[in-house]
Amino acid sequence: MALDKVAPIVIVTPFNVMTDRYDEFIEKVRKALAGTAGAKVGPKPKSKVESPVLDKGTFPVEQPPRWIHVELHGKTQGTTTPKPKVAIRSDDAYIMGFTNSTGRWFQLSKTGTTYKLVDDKAVMAGFDGNYNTLVGGVNNLPTLNLNKFSMAQAAAALWNKASTLSGGIGSDVVDDDDGDMLRANDPVKQAVATLAVAVCEAARFSPVSKVVNAGWIKDKVSVTPDEVNYIKEWGDLSTALLSWMDKQYKDDATIFKKFNGIGITNGEEALAVVRLVKLVIRSNMAAAPTTDEQLLAYAQLPKHGRYMAEVFAVRIPATAGGDRPAAPSLCTAATAAATSFTARKKNTPRSKPAATARVTWSSLGHRLATSAYGPIVFNLDLHDGNCGQADEEEDEKNTGRIVCDAIGGDFSNYNKAISETVLTRCGPAEVIYAVLSNGVQGRVDVKLAGLQSRDEVVLVGRIVARSKLFDFGCVLFYNEAAGVRVRPGELVPLARHALAVPLHMPLTIELDIRHGGSGDEIVRGELEFKTAIDGLHTGRLVGVNDAEFEVTILWSEYPW
């Protein structure tokens, strides 16, 4: 994909690795990365330091607001050594590309990626900048030596990347067909990882820059598990700091409670750690990437997920002046892989007529996300109190069926919301679903973690999961009538747990929970989770009177 325009470039004063002061260099990088809006977190004059907020984010496959170029110099034995540049996004402080000895740009993307970001003639490096790809995971960062000699070696490795080109300087082909797979001691991946920590993570976190600076001229210096914990929590720490600022720098105990385990209990302690605040964009605040170019660009992102299907809703149009179906309605979907789920319609009060019936999904048989490695069949058995009971033959006749041949040669509607209507015994029903080309399973649980009273409480409201890739959300919990009874420490009974989620796009869990009967708010807010191919991610949301809900997501790339 041709690059129409490169974002504005900010050039940091070149850094001579062997002679310049590292601490002064990192301050220059922080200054360059500070967002153009000028926002800073820190209650002046009380706070000793203010942390700048980065530029507002764009999609990973789009140009950032600005590029920050850092040029590395060095001298050994009287000769000038490599002067490569690295390109850092201004919205997330991630390295996205680097130059070699000829000045050619290499983009940190898998071989075959068609979209260009750092330069119109950029060559794909053959791997992305994820720590899983670079060093086997963030927990392996302490294995990196971050002293000045290692940083000089990293610069040399980028400079020597020219040797991997085939077909000459004009070629965009890289001899790295398995470049997205981790290879032991790959010098270029090690170099990118070293610079990512010694430059980017050091700019984000004071503890990282202090560790590197203290060991800059020593034989070996590495981050510790303490710094790794900060790196893991950067997004959530940024969100907490922004929330703290919005609340006039009050309510520290509530806002920073989830970080007590890593030694952060209040805003001042968070500011002492975080020097650059990421402006986290919630999924319901940004438009989904629905243009053909955006979807094509998304399809070019590293594919570590699987083909999966996700259903957002089954809509049943109400007849004019009538009531919507009152009895339970079932919808099942299955593929050749024999994965399935069951949906059960939940009724809303008749005093609140609507154009469509609300459908959520029951967990009956729905233990796994739906595979899309075969044709997907949707069976809708909808009935109301007037339809009566039908025998098996009539049930088969009146069951609406939609078949999506996702493995057919002409199927191309990946990563888009698809709407199809089928005739059922109760009239037409619309199914809205998507087939993902790069999906992972997220198994969601929501727990009432804390309440002022240990007594049972009746919960009403809704819990919705929403991916940034789509305008639609998946209803996990919906109850506006009798409510459900839950005690502190117990799980909220969700209608479904297993979701098929697009990789590389954040997943937001939105909670709007109230007391049954009084309708008083218990908690209202949202938690954003970064999608992953494995691992257990946890987030906490604190509501009125210290009511606390814990959301956990267990990620899996191949759940079947």
UniProtKB/Swiss-Prot annotation:
Keywords linked to the UniProt accession: Hydrolase, Plant defense, Protein synthesis inhibitor, Toxin
EC code: 3.2.2.22
Active-site residues from the entry: 201
Hydrolase as UniProt keyword: yes
Reaction(s) catalysed by this chain's protein: Endohydrolysis of the N-glycosidic bond at one specific adenosine on the 28S rRNA
Location of region: Disordered: 37-56
Expression triggers: By jasmonate.
Gene Ontology MF: a single term: toxin activity
GO annotation, biological process: defense response; negative regulation of translation
UniProt xrefs under InterPro entries: DUF6598, Ribosome-inact_prot_sf, Ribosome_inactivat_prot, Ribosome_inactivat_prot_CS, Ribosome_inactivat_prot_sub1
SUPFAM superfamilies (alphabetical): Ribosome inactivating proteins (RIP) (SSF56371)
Family to which the UniProt record says this protein belongs: Belongs to the ribosome-inactivating protein family. Type 1 RIP subfamily.
Protein name, UniProt field: 60 kDa jasmonate-induced protein
Organism of this sequence: Hordeum vulgare (Barley)
